[in-house]
């Protein structure tokens, strides 16, 4: 946003110097990128009129001009500008004037005396236009100092706006922030209604719903087509980076820069029937002001009359309905469009306009009626004409409504770390145009309609911090006591789990929390899935229901790259759809491991062998031992597991996971040609541990008895050991499985389990009779409950 310093000061009277103003703007978040001083050294430059222009006798491109500079006699000036002509009013630098680094002196050019220099806008440092002399209006007072005539000195200030500050795309919007920061007040603005003189109107229809909820239009007839843009208006535009075009166009640009409301002027005689806002039809064509013919789709908003689109709403007017040097009747448009309806439409067509930039960020929905009155007043003042009544069409239900926000004193102090006096809070917020009502906790605040960025309490606090001054917030070091968190005695932390698995020679991996739906179908995991609304890609469209699919896929990629021994683990969240529709998905923390290849690293002391179920179960049992968890294993029916080499994992009777070999059919589908052994279980139940209780150490010796049973294949060791513990009771210190045998001497369908019973009493030495009685009971129970028999 570029603007004139003097224009800003006309809206907010402040005593700050130019440098102080620039520093203030940057301090309140309106970062100043450039300040260009204008007219600093034009003391001897005056308004002059060329009375006569003759061709230079020695140079085809030079003219010898007789110039009236208001000094009573004509001055002879040699000039090479292509637009030098009799009657032209232009700036004249007198002898002795300093223009930039050049001091003007009397000189001879190709043998002809020249007593000054007629100047272009670029030579004066007022504009980049160097094509010819700076043409001034014909009624400019000859002899008057140019600086006085143009309202100089001045400066062109350019600021960089953040996307949330669309309200500062206007001089008046910036003025509110400056007034608040400088403890001043914004000058009252006259936007009173202009009384209609005629009854001529143009009907307005709104057919775009919430995308265009407000549209104002006014007919002005009989304007003077020869009226020119006055120098004060043209200079304000020029210093704001806008090149003057024609009076009507310049007025709409002026209103946009001053108030922030983009406008458009149509030649009324080119419009047919009612005008309105509607969606474009696919394939519809429109000739734009820049001469391009564009083909529209149905995503564009258009301004249309009874038979055709006449403008791209919020972006650019149409070529066929533009105002020209012959326009006598005009229709002024001022509207509010929803930012989402304009956003991105210009880029589709390669357009970037000031109007589109403002509408994309958000324009004050209350501005259209004010802007059309201001524009009307300027048209009548500068070009005459007869105004009709304003036609105001709106859909109130779709207009943004400012919210009332509770601003608490305590919250201000908590967020900023400083206490701001109530009187300063009220002064700053009112200077920003906000309405305040005092309440017990602080204030109820309603932001002005131009402030789209004010939605919550913290937005108001941010404004207070900006205006109060970030440099006035004291620098303090963080305080407070540091508390050392004691490690939980009832739960193993995740770091300990990681360390335990690393100690077992597993390497941690981190995979995406999103997986491919096709991969889950291969694993036959299709229930309770959580799809993503906006996935990164089609292959990452589902939140993972478990860790194993991603972990095994990673293992497969490593195995395919000649890794002979792969041992991976992962800790992470898994996700499941909630039972109640509409509820948030359920999250839980899991731990998983997957291994393949050699059981041990290659060495001379151990024979090479492949990893098997019992190796991975050993890793799991070591992990469980860290928390004291007593795990049980039962045959699993999971479809992704090998039917004879997988088990469900239980703790305290609750299934918490799975361990086993990945089904060969699944491994083949995943292009993995080695056996993969894996486990996954819920982390929460695994890491819970019971506080150890100190018990009495027996002073009496323990006794060991070894027993071997022939049991059916389907009977698990877990079931047998549970029967032993229940039968023996407190005398049992430990039961150990030290042999499992299937083969010669054992009938088909049976297996031999050899166990060691370690018995001990705290009060006496066990006798042979005591031990024999226990053994007898154990044998009887196992034979009865498990159809087993003692092996001789």
Curated annotation (Swiss-Prot):
Ribonucleoprotein as UniProt keyword: no
Species annotation: Xanthomonas oryzae pv. oryzae (strain KACC10331 / KXO85)
Alphabetic keyword roster: Aminoacyl-tRNA synthetase, ATP-binding, Cytoplasm, Ligase, Magnesium, Metal-binding, Nucleotide-binding, Protein biosynthesis, RNA-binding, tRNA-binding
EC number(s) from the headed UniProt entry: 6.1.1.20
Residue ranges constituting the tRNA-binding domain according to the UniProt record: 39-147
Residues that, per the record, bind Mg(2+): 453, 459, 462-463
Reaction catalysed by this enzyme: tRNA(Phe) + L-phenylalanine + ATP = L-phenylalanyl-tRNA(Phe) + AMP + diphosphate + H(+)
Domain of life: Bacteria
Domain B5: 400-475
Assembly description: Tetramer of two alpha and two beta subunits.
Upper taxonomic lineage: Bacteria, Pseudomonadati, Pseudomonadota, Gammaproteobacteria, Lysobacterales
HAMAP family: Phe_tRNA_synth_beta1
Matches recorded under Gene3D superfamilies: 3.30.56.10, Bira Bifunctional Protein, Domain 2, Ferrodoxin-fold anticodon-binding domain, Nucleic acid-binding proteins, Phenylalanyl-trna Synthetase, Chain B, domain 3
Keyword Nucleotide-binding: yes
Family under the similarity heading: Belongs to the phenylalanyl-tRNA synthetase beta subunit family. Type 1 subfamily.
Chief place where the protein resides: cytoplasm
Signal peptide: none
Cofactor binding comment, as recorded: Binds 2 magnesium ions per tetramer.
Localisation per UniProt entry: Cytoplasm
Any GO BP: phenylalanyl-tRNA aminoacylation
Gene Ontology CC annotation, any one: phenylalanine-tRNA ligase complex
GO MF term set: ATP binding; magnesium ion binding; phenylalanine-tRNA ligase activity; tRNA binding
Necessary cofactors: Mg(2+)
Protein name, entry field: Phenylalanine--tRNA ligase beta subunit
């Amino acid at each position: 946003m570029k603007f004139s310093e003097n224009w800003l000061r006309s809206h907010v009277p402040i005593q700050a110097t130019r440098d102080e103003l620039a520093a203030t703007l940057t301090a309140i978040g309106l970062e100043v990128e450039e300040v260009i001083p204008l007219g600093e050294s034009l003391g001897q430059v005056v308004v002059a009129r060329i009375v006569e222009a003759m061709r230079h006798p020695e140079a085809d491109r030079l003219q010898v001009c007789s110039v009236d500079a208001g000094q009573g006699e004509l001055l002879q000036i040699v000039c090479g500008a292509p637009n030098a002509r009799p009657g032209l009013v232009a700036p004249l630098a007198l002898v002795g004037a300093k223009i930039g680094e050049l001091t003007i002196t009397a000189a001879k050019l190709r043998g002809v005396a020249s007593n000054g220099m007629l100047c272009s806008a670029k030579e004066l440092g007022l504009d980049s236009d160097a094509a010819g002399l700076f043409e001034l209006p014909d009624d400019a007072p000859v002899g008057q100092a140019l600086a006085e005539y143009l309202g100089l000195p001045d400066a062109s200030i350019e600021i960089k706006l953040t996307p949330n500050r669309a309200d500062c795309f206007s001089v008046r919007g910036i003025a509110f922030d400056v007034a608040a920061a400088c403890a001043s007040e914004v000058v009252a603005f006259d936007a009173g209604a202009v009384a209609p003189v005629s009854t001529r109107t143009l009907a307005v229809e709104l057919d775009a719903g919430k995308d265009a909820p407000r549209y104002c239009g006014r007919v002005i007839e009989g304007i003077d087509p020869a009226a020119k843009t006055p120098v004060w208006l043209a200079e304000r535009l020029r210093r704001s980076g806008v090149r003057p075009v024609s009076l009507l166009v310049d007025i709409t640009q002026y209103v946009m820069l001053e108030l922030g409301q983009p406008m458009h002027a149509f030649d009324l005689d080119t419009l047919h029937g009612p005008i309105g806002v509607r969606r474009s039809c696919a394939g519809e064509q429109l000739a734009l002001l820049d001469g391009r013919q564009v083909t529209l789709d149905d995503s564009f908003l258009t301004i249309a009359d009874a038979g055709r689109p006449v403008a791209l709403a919020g972006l650019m007017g149409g070529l066929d309905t533009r105002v020209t040097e012959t326009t006598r009747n005009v229709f002024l448009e001022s509207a509010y469009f929803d930012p989402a309806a304009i956003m991105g439409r210009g880029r589709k067509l390669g357009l970037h306009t000031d109007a589109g930039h403002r509408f994309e960020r958000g324009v004050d929905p209350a501005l259209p009626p004010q802007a059309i009155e201001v524009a009307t007043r300027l048209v009548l003042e500068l070009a005459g004409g007869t105004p009709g009544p304003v036609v105001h069409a709106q859909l109130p239900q779709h207009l943004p409504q400012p919210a009332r926000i509770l601003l608490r004193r305590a919250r201000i102090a908590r967020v900023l770390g400083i206490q701001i006096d109530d009187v300063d809070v009220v002064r700053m917020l009112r200077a920003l145009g906000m309405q305040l009502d005092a309440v017990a906790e602080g204030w109820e605040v309603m932001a002005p309609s131009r402030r789209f960025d004010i939605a919550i309490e913290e937005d108001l606090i941010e404004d207070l911090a900006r205006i109060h001054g970030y440099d006035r917030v004291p620098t303090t070091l963080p305080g407070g006591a540091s508390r050392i968190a004691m490690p939980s005695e009832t739960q193993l932390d995740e770091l300990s789990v990681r360390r335990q698995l690393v100690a077992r020679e597993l390497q941690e991996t981190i995979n995406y929390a999103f997986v491919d739906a096709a991969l889950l179908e291969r694993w036959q995991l299709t229930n309770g899935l959580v799809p993503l609304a906006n996935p990164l890609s089609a292959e990452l469209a589902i939140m993972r229901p478990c860790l194993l699919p991603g972990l095994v896929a990673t293992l497969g990629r490593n195995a395919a790259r000649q890794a002979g021994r792969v041992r991976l683990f992962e800790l992470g969240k898994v996700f499941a759809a909630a039972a109640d529709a509409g509820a948030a998905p359920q999250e839980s923390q899991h731990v998983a491991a997957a291994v393949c290849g050699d059981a041990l690293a290659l060495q001379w002391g151990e024979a090479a062998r492949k990893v098997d179920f019992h190796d991975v179960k050993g890793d799991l049992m070591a992990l469980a031992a860290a928390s004291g968890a007593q795990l049980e294993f039962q045959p699993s029916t999971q479809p992704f597991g090998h039917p004879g080499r997988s088990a469900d994992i239980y703790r305290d009777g609750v299934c918490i996971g799975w361990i086993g070999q990945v089904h060969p059919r699944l491994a083949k589908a995943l292009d993995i040609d080695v056996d993969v052994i894996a486990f996954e279980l819920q982390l929460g139940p695994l890491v819970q541990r019971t506080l150890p209780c100190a018990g009495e150490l027996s002073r009496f010796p323990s006794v060991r008895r070894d027993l071997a049973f022939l049991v059916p294949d389907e009977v698990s060791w877990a079931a047998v050991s549970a029967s032993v513990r229940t039968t023996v009771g407190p005398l049992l210190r430990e039961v150990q499985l030290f042999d499992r045998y299937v083969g010669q001497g054992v009938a088909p369908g049976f297996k031999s389990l050899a166990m060691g019973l370690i018995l001990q009493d705290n009060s006496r030495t066990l006798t042979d009779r005591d031990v024999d009685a226990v053994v007898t009971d154990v044998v009887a129970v196992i034979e009865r409950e498990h159809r087993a028999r003692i092996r001789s």
